[in-house]
């Protein structure tokens, strides 16, 4: 635009040159404003983080300090309606609105000592929070960091457009003098007229709208995802999701709840007290489920003088009492009657996993159906046995499943599908899923999963809700449609304006108006993704 304005001044079209710069400057202001709308996700996210916290000192005095000065072990007072300043454990049952993290406005009940997260809102009465992470290590800080990184990683389409642009601009700079020469030497036009139309050509052939076709739209889609609890690690992941043809899914924490629940038991109260006392020394999920189920039992009468020992890989032992898997009883003379021993009140107690099958997410049923209706094959890969795999697959509507999968088996399934030229998605939440997530074309991690799984993935679903993945799939579809429409529109405008100029039907101000107008329209079209639902 600057070159065109200078050219207009050279041939004594000062007023048109000035008008060109005025229109260009006004358009730039509008473009910058529109583009900034798509990058506001970071500032909006940061607005959910309080800058100060009410720390309770050892003497009970409350001091307002910057959040970044909090350290692990500090006690913080969180009043009703306040945003929680940092990750920590609540001192009692609380109701928390986690919309800033998950996009879900329905309050979540957190039990005593359960972790609450920075940026969420205390919907109940005030409580005390024990700080478990520094301000740089909170879930919210990690989300902000991921969004920042995603916005700095261009999509494949953006990279392609940038590569084309550099070559295209060179061709325009070479082509304009050639165009002027043709008009002057072969069309019998005066130098002034030829040069003027050359400046118009320089203006209309500029690829500004084409360059803006992808980036603002991609940033808007990433921002939309962040506000809805979906984190994309760059534009490439955002674009690729819509091309997925097959989705391999882990079971626990993805289709089913990650926590075990006790559904049935056969033991008297004294036996249960012994079991709970022993399981309090274990961090195994089944042990935690048992302790949670019977947390109201009075354990004061239980003899805790004997040490509790771990039977590696099998269970726990306290004196003559064993709690564990069947192989924990391998030294018994009649191993085929484990359950009979329980019923008979034997002090050797069996706690089996068969009675603690996890429940499935209601959202998983709808998500699986939606993916299947979109012609995406959904396959369950689980390390559980055939019975559990068949049960869960049937409940959520999956017809193809494989049980007893090791991590290398999941990788093999992913690679085999890729050899058939399929675009493969893999969703999981555990360390055992990380290799498959890394090998898949699109790796999707559940936010409650391991950090290894999240590091290996391209997309992170903050809340364990498979419907969020389908939402992101539809968002990706819409992004690609908008980018395609932008590209077609911007190229069409360039072609039409170039043809009009060739036939002498275009002046410089009109050329600038249409050129800049097309760029603004392309950006605004991409910004629609900010409010997409």
What spans do the regions from the language model cover?
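Actuator/coupling domain of P-type ATPases
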Residues: 1-50, 104-193, 479
């Amino acid at each position: 635009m600057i070159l065109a304005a200078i050219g207009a001044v050279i041939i004594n079209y000062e007023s048109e040159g000035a008008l060109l710069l005025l229109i260009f400057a006004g358009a730039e202001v509008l473009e910058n404003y529109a583009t900034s709308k798509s990058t506001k996700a970071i500032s909006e996210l940061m607005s959910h983080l309080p800058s100060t916290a009410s720390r309770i000192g050892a003497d009970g005095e409350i001091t307002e300090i910057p959040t970044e000065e909090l350290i692990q072990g500090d006690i913080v007072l969180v009043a009703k309606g306040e945003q929680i300043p940092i990750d920590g454990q609540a001192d009692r049952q609380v109701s928390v609105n986690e919309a800033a993290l998950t996009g879900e406005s329905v309050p979540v009940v957190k039990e005593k000592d359960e972790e609450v997260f920075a940026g969420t809102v205390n919907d109940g009465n005030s409580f005390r929070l024990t700080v478990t992470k520094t301000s740089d290590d909170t879930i919210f800080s990690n989300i902000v960091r991921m969004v920042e990184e995603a916005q700095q990683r261009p999509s494949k389409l953006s990279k392609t457009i940038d590569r084309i642009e550099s070559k295209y601009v060179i061709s325009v700079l070479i082509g304009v003098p050639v165009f002027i020469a043709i008009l002057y030497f072969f069309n019998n036009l005066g130098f002034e007229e030829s040069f003027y139309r050359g400046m118009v050509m320089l203006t209309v052939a500029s690829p500004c709208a084409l360059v803006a076709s992808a980036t603002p739209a991609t940033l808007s889609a990433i921002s939309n995802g962040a506000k809805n609890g979906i984190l994309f690690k760059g534009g490439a992941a955002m674009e690729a999701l819509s091309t997925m043809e097959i989705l391999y899914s882990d079971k626990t924490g993805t289709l089913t709840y990650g926590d075990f629940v006790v559904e049935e038991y056969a033991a008297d109260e004294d036996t249960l007290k012994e079991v709970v006392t022993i399981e309090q020394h274990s961090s195994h999920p089944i042990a935690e489920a048992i302790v949670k189920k019977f947390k109201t039992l009075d354990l004061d009468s239980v003899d805790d003088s004997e040490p509790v020992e771990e039977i590696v890989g099998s269970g726990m032992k306290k004196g003559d009492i064993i709690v564990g898997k069947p192989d924990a009883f391998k030294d018994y003379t009649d191993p085929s009657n484990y359950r009979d021993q329980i019923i008979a009140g034997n002090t050797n107690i069996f706690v089996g996993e068969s009675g603690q099958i996890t429940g499935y997410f209601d959202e998983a049923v709808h998500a699986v159906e939606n993916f299947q209706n979109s012609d995406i094959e959904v396959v369950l890969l689980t390390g559980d046995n055939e019975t559990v795999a068949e049960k869960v697959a049937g409940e959520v509507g999956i017809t193809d499943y494989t049980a007893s999968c090791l991590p290398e088996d999941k990788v093999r399934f992913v690679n085999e599908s890729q050899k058939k030229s399929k675009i493969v998605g893999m969703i999981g939440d555990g360390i055992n899923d990380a290799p498959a997530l890394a090998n898949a074309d699109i790796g999707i991690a559940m936010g409650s999963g391991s950090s290894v799984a999240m590091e290996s993935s391209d997309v992170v679903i903050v809340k364990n809700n498979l419907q969020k993945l389908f939402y992101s799939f539809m968002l990706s579809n819409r992004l690609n449609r908008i980018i395609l429409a932008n590209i077609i529109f911007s190229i069409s405008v360039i072609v039409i304006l170039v043809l009009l100029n060739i036939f002498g039907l275009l002046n410089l101000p009109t050329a600038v108006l249409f050129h800049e107008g097309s760029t603004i329209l392309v950006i605004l079209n991409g910004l629609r993704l900010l409010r997409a639902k």
